Amino acid sequence: MAQKETGKQEILTQGQVKPPFTGPENDGSRPQADTPGPKQTEQANKWAVLVIVAIGVFMATLDSSIVNISLPAIASSFGVPLSGEIEWVIIAYLVVTAGVLLTAGRISDMIGRKPIWAAGLIIFTVGSAFCGFAPSLGLLIAARALQGLGGALIMAISPAMLTSAFPAHERGRALGLNAVVVALGVSTGPTLGGIITSTLSWRWIFFVNLPIGIIGLILTMRILKEKMRWNRGKFDPAGAILLALGLVAITLGLSFGQEWGWNSPLLIGCLATGVIALILLYIVEKRVADPIINLSLLHNRVFLSATLSLVLSFLALFAVSFMLPFYLEELRGFTTVQAGLLLTPLPLTIAVIAPFSGTLADRFGTRWLAAGGLTLACIGLI
Protein backbone atom coordinates (compact mmCIF):
# COMPACT_ATOMS: atom_id res chain seq x y z
CA MET A 1 0.00 0.00 0.00
CA ALA A 2 2.83 2.36 0.87
CA GLN A 3 4.50 1.66 -2.45
CA LYS A 4 1.32 2.51 -4.34
CA GLU A 5 0.92 5.77 -2.49
CA THR A 6 4.56 6.65 -3.12
CA GLY A 7 4.17 5.97 -6.84
CA LYS A 8 1.07 8.12 -6.96
CA GLN A 9 2.90 10.97 -5.26
CA GLU A 10 5.75 10.74 -7.81
CA ILE A 11 3.27 10.98 -10.68
CA LEU A 12 1.66 14.03 -9.14
CA THR A 13 5.05 15.67 -8.66
CA GLN A 14 6.07 15.04 -12.25
CA GLY A 15 2.78 16.38 -13.55
CA GLN A 16 2.98 19.67 -11.73
CA VAL A 17 3.51 22.80 -13.79
CA LYS A 18 6.90 24.26 -13.02
CA PRO A 19 8.42 27.55 -14.11
CA PRO A 20 10.75 27.35 -17.12
CA PHE A 21 13.80 28.07 -14.99
CA THR A 22 13.94 25.05 -12.73
CA GLY A 23 16.82 23.99 -10.60
CA PRO A 24 16.87 20.86 -8.49
CA GLU A 25 13.66 19.17 -7.50
CA ASN A 26 11.39 20.91 -5.04
CA ASP A 27 13.08 20.85 -1.66
CA GLY A 28 10.08 22.00 0.29
CA SER A 29 10.68 25.75 0.00
CA ARG A 30 8.10 26.00 -2.78
CA PRO A 31 4.51 25.04 -1.97
CA GLN A 32 3.26 21.80 -3.45
CA ALA A 33 0.26 22.38 -5.70
CA ASP A 34 -1.73 19.45 -4.36
CA THR A 35 -0.89 19.88 -0.68
CA PRO A 36 -3.67 21.68 1.19
CA GLY A 37 -2.67 24.35 3.67
CA PRO A 38 -4.36 26.83 5.99
CA LYS A 39 -6.92 28.62 3.87
CA GLN A 40 -6.47 32.06 5.40
CA THR A 41 -2.68 31.98 4.97
CA GLU A 42 -3.03 30.74 1.36
CA GLN A 43 -5.49 33.48 0.46
CA ALA A 44 -3.39 36.24 2.06
CA ASN A 45 -0.12 35.12 0.51
CA LYS A 46 -1.21 34.41 -3.03
CA TRP A 47 -3.13 37.65 -3.60
CA ALA A 48 -0.39 39.73 -2.00
CA VAL A 49 2.14 38.09 -4.31
CA LEU A 50 -0.13 38.78 -7.29
CA VAL A 51 -0.29 42.49 -6.41
CA ILE A 52 3.50 42.71 -6.04
CA VAL A 53 4.10 40.90 -9.32
CA ALA A 54 1.51 43.07 -11.06
CA ILE A 55 3.30 46.26 -10.00
CA GLY A 56 6.68 45.12 -11.31
CA VAL A 57 5.32 43.66 -14.55
CA PHE A 58 3.17 46.74 -15.23
CA MET A 59 6.17 49.03 -14.79
CA ALA A 60 8.36 46.98 -17.13
CA THR A 61 5.74 46.60 -19.87
CA LEU A 62 4.61 50.22 -19.58
CA ASP A 63 8.17 51.36 -20.15
CA SER A 64 8.60 49.30 -23.31
CA SER A 65 5.53 50.71 -25.04
CA ILE A 66 5.85 54.24 -23.71
CA VAL A 67 9.39 54.54 -25.11
CA ASN A 68 8.45 53.33 -28.59
CA ILE A 69 5.88 56.06 -29.12
CA SER A 70 8.34 58.75 -27.94
CA LEU A 71 11.33 57.76 -30.11
CA PRO A 72 10.67 60.46 -32.74
CA ALA A 73 10.64 63.12 -30.00
CA ILE A 74 13.83 61.72 -28.45
CA ALA A 75 15.58 61.73 -31.84
CA SER A 76 14.51 65.32 -32.42
CA SER A 77 15.68 66.38 -28.94
CA PHE A 78 19.21 65.06 -29.50
CA GLY A 79 19.32 66.13 -33.15
CA VAL A 80 19.83 62.65 -34.59
CA PRO A 81 18.06 60.91 -37.50
CA LEU A 82 15.37 58.28 -37.00
CA SER A 83 17.79 55.52 -37.96
CA GLY A 84 21.17 54.61 -36.60
CA GLU A 85 22.05 55.61 -33.05
CA ILE A 86 18.47 56.21 -31.92
CA GLU A 87 17.71 52.53 -32.47
CA TRP A 88 20.02 51.71 -29.57
CA VAL A 89 17.51 53.25 -27.17
CA ILE A 90 15.42 50.14 -27.83
CA ILE A 91 18.14 47.64 -28.75
CA ALA A 92 20.28 48.28 -25.64
CA TYR A 93 17.33 47.28 -23.47
CA LEU A 94 16.60 44.16 -25.54
CA VAL A 95 20.22 43.00 -25.74
CA VAL A 96 20.80 43.16 -21.99
CA THR A 97 17.45 41.52 -21.29
CA ALA A 98 18.20 38.67 -23.71
CA GLY A 99 21.61 38.08 -22.17
CA VAL A 100 20.51 38.10 -18.53
CA LEU A 101 16.97 36.67 -18.52
CA LEU A 102 17.67 32.94 -18.14
CA THR A 103 20.64 33.48 -15.85
CA ALA A 104 18.45 35.56 -13.54
CA GLY A 105 15.96 32.71 -13.35
CA ARG A 106 18.70 30.24 -12.42
CA ILE A 107 20.12 32.51 -9.73
CA SER A 108 16.65 32.93 -8.21
CA ASP A 109 16.43 29.14 -7.94
CA MET A 110 19.67 29.20 -5.95
CA ILE A 111 19.24 32.13 -3.57
CA GLY A 112 15.49 32.72 -3.55
CA ARG A 113 13.14 34.94 -5.50
CA LYS A 114 12.76 37.88 -3.12
CA PRO A 115 16.35 39.22 -3.41
CA ILE A 116 16.30 38.93 -7.21
CA TRP A 117 12.87 40.60 -7.41
CA ALA A 118 13.91 43.44 -5.08
CA ALA A 119 17.15 43.95 -7.00
CA GLY A 120 15.19 44.11 -10.25
CA LEU A 121 12.87 46.80 -8.89
CA ILE A 122 15.78 48.85 -7.55
CA ILE A 123 17.87 48.61 -10.74
CA PHE A 124 14.93 49.37 -13.00
CA THR A 125 13.83 52.37 -10.93
CA VAL A 126 17.36 53.80 -10.73
CA GLY A 127 17.82 53.20 -14.45
CA SER A 128 14.58 55.09 -15.13
CA ALA A 129 15.87 58.07 -13.16
CA PHE A 130 19.14 58.03 -15.11
CA CYS A 131 17.18 57.90 -18.39
CA GLY A 132 15.13 60.92 -17.40
CA PHE A 133 18.19 63.00 -16.50
CA ALA A 134 20.40 61.77 -19.38
CA PRO A 135 22.16 64.80 -20.96
CA SER A 136 23.22 62.94 -24.11
CA LEU A 137 22.05 60.10 -26.30
CA GLY A 138 25.01 57.94 -25.27
CA LEU A 139 24.16 58.21 -21.58
CA LEU A 140 20.50 57.56 -22.35
CA ILE A 141 21.47 54.34 -24.13
CA ALA A 142 23.65 53.30 -21.17
CA ALA A 143 20.78 53.99 -18.78
CA ARG A 144 18.44 51.95 -20.98
CA ALA A 145 20.89 49.04 -20.72
CA LEU A 146 20.68 49.38 -16.93
CA GLN A 147 16.91 49.34 -17.22
CA GLY A 148 17.19 46.18 -19.30
CA LEU A 149 19.09 44.48 -16.49
CA GLY A 150 16.36 45.38 -14.00
CA GLY A 151 13.62 44.38 -16.41
CA ALA A 152 15.28 40.99 -16.98
CA LEU A 153 15.32 40.29 -13.24
CA ILE A 154 11.64 41.25 -12.97
CA MET A 155 10.35 39.32 -15.97
CA ALA A 156 12.49 36.23 -15.33
CA ILE A 157 10.87 35.30 -12.04
CA SER A 158 7.38 36.82 -12.22
CA PRO A 159 5.77 33.60 -13.61
CA ALA A 160 7.63 31.48 -11.04
CA MET A 161 6.41 33.70 -8.20
CA LEU A 162 2.82 33.23 -9.32
CA THR A 163 3.02 29.48 -9.91
CA SER A 164 4.58 29.04 -6.47
CA ALA A 165 1.94 31.14 -4.72
CA PHE A 166 -1.15 29.70 -6.41
CA PRO A 167 -2.35 26.07 -6.30
CA ALA A 168 -2.43 24.10 -9.55
CA HIS A 169 -6.15 24.59 -10.20
CA GLU A 170 -5.79 28.40 -9.97
CA ARG A 171 -2.58 28.94 -11.89
CA GLY A 172 -4.32 29.55 -15.19
CA ARG A 173 -6.39 32.26 -13.55
CA ALA A 174 -3.31 33.83 -11.94
CA LEU A 175 -1.33 33.80 -15.18
CA GLY A 176 -4.37 35.16 -17.00
CA LEU A 177 -4.52 38.09 -14.57
CA ASN A 178 -0.81 38.59 -15.09
CA ALA A 179 -1.47 38.73 -18.84
CA VAL A 180 -4.05 41.43 -18.13
CA VAL A 181 -1.39 43.46 -16.35
CA VAL A 182 0.99 43.01 -19.27
CA ALA A 183 -1.69 44.10 -21.71
CA LEU A 184 -2.65 47.10 -19.58
CA GLY A 185 0.98 48.20 -19.44
CA VAL A 186 1.38 47.84 -23.20
CA SER A 187 -1.97 49.51 -23.96
CA THR A 188 -1.49 52.38 -21.50
CA GLY A 189 2.00 53.17 -22.75
CA PRO A 190 1.27 54.59 -26.22
CA THR A 191 -1.57 56.85 -25.07
CA LEU A 192 0.14 57.96 -21.85
CA GLY A 193 3.43 58.43 -23.67
CA GLY A 194 1.79 60.53 -26.34
CA ILE A 195 0.11 62.77 -23.77
CA ILE A 196 3.24 63.15 -21.63
CA THR A 197 5.51 63.83 -24.61
CA SER A 198 3.10 66.38 -26.08
CA THR A 199 2.36 68.24 -22.83
CA LEU A 200 5.57 67.88 -20.80
CA SER A 201 8.69 66.25 -22.24
CA TRP A 202 9.89 62.81 -23.28
CA ARG A 203 11.96 62.75 -20.09
CA TRP A 204 8.81 62.34 -18.03
CA ILE A 205 8.03 59.00 -19.66
CA PHE A 206 10.90 57.65 -17.56
CA PHE A 207 10.11 59.61 -14.42
CA VAL A 208 6.64 58.03 -14.33
CA ASN A 209 8.32 54.76 -13.32
CA LEU A 210 9.79 56.18 -10.12
CA PRO A 211 6.67 56.14 -7.88
CA ILE A 212 5.63 52.75 -9.28
CA GLY A 213 9.01 51.22 -8.52
CA ILE A 214 9.19 52.71 -5.03
CA ILE A 215 5.72 51.43 -4.12
CA GLY A 216 6.57 47.98 -5.46
CA LEU A 217 9.81 47.86 -3.47
CA ILE A 218 8.10 48.90 -0.23
CA LEU A 219 5.45 46.19 -0.64
CA THR A 220 8.11 43.62 -1.50
CA MET A 221 10.10 44.30 1.66
CA ARG A 222 7.03 44.40 3.91
CA ILE A 223 5.04 41.45 2.54
CA LEU A 224 7.46 38.87 1.13
CA LYS A 225 9.12 37.05 4.04
CA GLU A 226 11.49 34.84 2.08
CA LYS A 227 15.09 35.08 3.24
CA MET A 228 18.17 34.88 1.07
CA ARG A 229 19.82 31.46 1.02
CA TRP A 230 22.41 29.60 -1.02
CA ASN A 231 21.45 25.97 -0.94
CA ARG A 232 20.26 24.92 -4.38
CA GLY A 233 23.36 23.81 -6.22
CA LYS A 234 26.29 25.57 -7.83
CA PHE A 235 26.24 28.39 -10.33
CA ASP A 236 27.35 27.63 -13.90
CA PRO A 237 29.48 30.61 -15.00
CA ALA A 238 30.59 29.05 -18.30
CA GLY A 239 26.99 28.34 -19.27
CA ALA A 240 25.89 31.84 -18.27
CA ILE A 241 28.64 33.48 -20.35
CA LEU A 242 28.00 31.32 -23.42
CA LEU A 243 24.25 31.86 -23.14
CA ALA A 244 24.63 35.64 -22.86
CA LEU A 245 27.14 35.76 -25.73
CA GLY A 246 24.95 33.66 -28.00
CA LEU A 247 21.73 35.55 -27.37
CA VAL A 248 23.37 38.99 -27.50
CA ALA A 249 25.19 38.22 -30.78
CA ILE A 250 22.06 36.89 -32.46
CA THR A 251 19.93 39.78 -31.17
CA LEU A 252 22.43 42.33 -32.48
CA GLY A 253 22.68 40.62 -35.84
CA LEU A 254 18.94 40.46 -36.37
CA SER A 255 18.48 44.04 -35.15
CA PHE A 256 21.07 45.57 -37.49
CA GLY A 257 20.72 43.21 -40.44
CA GLN A 258 19.04 45.77 -42.66
CA GLU A 259 21.44 48.55 -41.73
CA TRP A 260 24.62 46.49 -42.08
CA GLY A 261 23.40 44.52 -45.08
CA TRP A 262 22.34 40.90 -44.91
CA ASN A 263 25.47 39.80 -46.78
CA SER A 264 27.92 41.94 -44.80
CA PRO A 265 30.86 40.21 -43.05
CA LEU A 266 29.94 41.98 -39.80
CA LEU A 267 26.44 40.53 -39.78
CA ILE A 268 27.59 37.04 -40.78
CA GLY A 269 30.29 37.13 -38.10
CA CYS A 270 27.80 38.28 -35.48
CA LEU A 271 25.28 35.55 -36.27
CA ALA A 272 28.02 32.91 -36.56
CA THR A 273 29.37 33.90 -33.14
CA GLY A 274 25.92 33.52 -31.65
CA VAL A 275 25.32 30.11 -33.20
CA ILE A 276 28.76 28.79 -32.17
CA ALA A 277 28.25 30.06 -28.62
CA LEU A 278 24.90 28.27 -28.35
CA ILE A 279 26.40 25.03 -29.72
CA LEU A 280 29.19 25.23 -27.13
CA LEU A 281 26.53 25.95 -24.52
CA TYR A 282 24.77 22.70 -25.38
CA ILE A 283 28.03 20.76 -25.05
CA VAL A 284 28.95 22.40 -21.73
CA GLU A 285 25.51 22.03 -20.18
CA LYS A 286 25.53 18.26 -20.78
CA ARG A 287 28.64 17.93 -18.61
CA VAL A 288 27.90 20.11 -15.57
CA ALA A 289 25.95 19.02 -12.51
CA ASP A 290 23.92 22.24 -12.19
CA PRO A 291 23.41 23.65 -15.71
CA ILE A 292 22.07 27.12 -16.40
CA ILE A 293 19.51 25.45 -18.70
CA ASN A 294 17.87 22.12 -18.01
CA LEU A 295 18.44 20.47 -21.40
CA SER A 296 15.86 17.78 -20.64
CA LEU A 297 13.23 20.44 -21.28
CA LEU A 298 14.26 20.45 -24.94
CA HIS A 299 13.21 16.80 -25.16
CA ASN A 300 9.77 17.61 -23.77
CA ARG A 301 7.62 17.94 -26.89
CA VAL A 302 4.86 19.88 -25.13
CA PHE A 303 7.26 22.41 -23.61
CA LEU A 304 9.23 22.84 -26.83
CA SER A 305 6.19 23.28 -29.07
CA ALA A 306 4.54 25.67 -26.61
CA THR A 307 7.70 27.78 -26.40
CA LEU A 308 8.10 27.95 -30.19
CA SER A 309 4.43 28.87 -30.58
CA LEU A 310 4.84 31.64 -28.03
CA VAL A 311 7.91 33.05 -29.80
CA LEU A 312 6.21 32.99 -33.21
CA SER A 313 3.01 34.57 -31.89
CA PHE A 314 4.95 37.39 -30.23
CA LEU A 315 6.91 37.99 -33.44
CA ALA A 316 3.69 38.19 -35.42
CA LEU A 317 1.70 40.36 -33.04
CA PHE A 318 4.20 42.66 -31.35
CA ALA A 319 7.18 43.08 -33.67
CA VAL A 320 5.25 45.63 -35.73
CA SER A 321 4.76 47.84 -32.67
CA PHE A 322 8.34 49.08 -32.98
CA MET A 323 7.90 50.46 -36.49
CA LEU A 324 4.31 51.66 -36.27
CA PRO A 325 5.08 54.88 -34.32
CA PHE A 326 7.52 55.98 -37.04
CA TYR A 327 5.09 55.04 -39.80
CA LEU A 328 2.11 56.79 -38.21
CA GLU A 329 3.94 59.96 -37.15
CA GLU A 330 6.51 60.45 -39.91
CA LEU A 331 4.70 59.08 -42.98
CA ARG A 332 1.02 59.47 -42.13
CA GLY A 333 1.34 62.74 -40.22
CA PHE A 334 -0.48 61.70 -37.05
CA THR A 335 0.31 63.43 -33.78
CA THR A 336 1.98 61.51 -30.96
CA VAL A 337 -1.33 61.25 -29.08
CA GLN A 338 -3.18 60.01 -32.17
CA ALA A 339 -0.49 57.42 -32.89
CA GLY A 340 -0.70 56.23 -29.29
CA LEU A 341 -4.46 55.78 -29.53
CA LEU A 342 -4.09 53.80 -32.77
CA LEU A 343 -1.68 51.39 -31.04
CA THR A 344 -4.04 50.77 -28.12
CA PRO A 345 -6.69 48.30 -29.48
CA LEU A 346 -4.45 45.19 -29.59
CA PRO A 347 -3.22 45.20 -25.98
CA LEU A 348 -6.56 46.51 -24.72
CA THR A 349 -8.33 43.52 -26.27
CA ILE A 350 -5.80 41.22 -24.64
CA ALA A 351 -6.53 42.83 -21.28
CA VAL A 352 -10.26 42.14 -21.67
CA ILE A 353 -9.97 38.55 -22.91
CA ALA A 354 -7.02 37.25 -20.85
CA PRO A 355 -8.90 36.61 -17.55
CA PHE A 356 -11.50 34.49 -19.36
CA SER A 357 -8.85 32.54 -21.28
CA GLY A 358 -7.01 31.72 -18.06
CA THR A 359 -10.17 30.39 -16.43
CA LEU A 360 -11.07 28.38 -19.54
CA ALA A 361 -7.56 26.92 -19.61
CA ASP A 362 -7.98 25.72 -16.01
CA ARG A 363 -11.24 23.98 -16.95
CA PHE A 364 -10.71 22.63 -20.45
CA GLY A 365 -6.96 22.66 -21.04
CA THR A 366 -4.81 24.80 -23.29
CA ARG A 367 -4.45 22.86 -26.55
CA TRP A 368 -7.55 23.93 -28.46
CA LEU A 369 -7.72 27.28 -26.70
CA ALA A 370 -4.21 28.21 -27.87
CA ALA A 371 -4.87 26.92 -31.39
CA GLY A 372 -8.05 28.96 -31.62
CA GLY A 373 -6.30 32.08 -30.39
CA LEU A 374 -3.51 31.75 -32.93
CA THR A 375 -6.07 31.20 -35.69
CA LEU A 376 -7.88 34.42 -34.78
CA ALA A 377 -4.54 36.26 -34.65
CA CYS A 378 -3.69 35.06 -38.17
CA ILE A 379 -7.08 36.23 -39.45
CA GLY A 380 -6.52 39.63 -37.83
CA LEU A 381 -3.11 40.03 -39.47
CA ILE A 382 -4.59 39.24 -42.87
For each feature predicted by the language model, list its residue ranges.
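N-terminal acidic, proline/glycine-rich, low-complexity intrinsically disordered segments
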Residues: 1-20
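Transmembrane-helix bundle of Major Facilitator Superfamily
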Residues: 15, 19-23, 27-222, 346-382
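Helix-boundary and loop/linker segments of multi-pass membrane transporters
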Residues: 38-46, 232-234, 260, 295-302
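12-transmembrane solute porter fold
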Residues: 49-58, 62, 67-69, 238-240, ...
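Hydrophobic/aromatic residues in alpha-helical transmembrane segments
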Residues: 67, 91, 104, 142, ...
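Hydrophobic alpha-helical interface/terminus motif in multipass membrane transporters
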Residues: 71-74, 158, 162, 196, ...
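A membrane-interface helix-boundary motif in multi-pass transporters
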Residues: 198-210, 256-267, 335
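C-terminal membrane-cytosol helix-exit motif in multi-pass small-molecule transporters
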Residues: 210-229, 244-256, 273-288
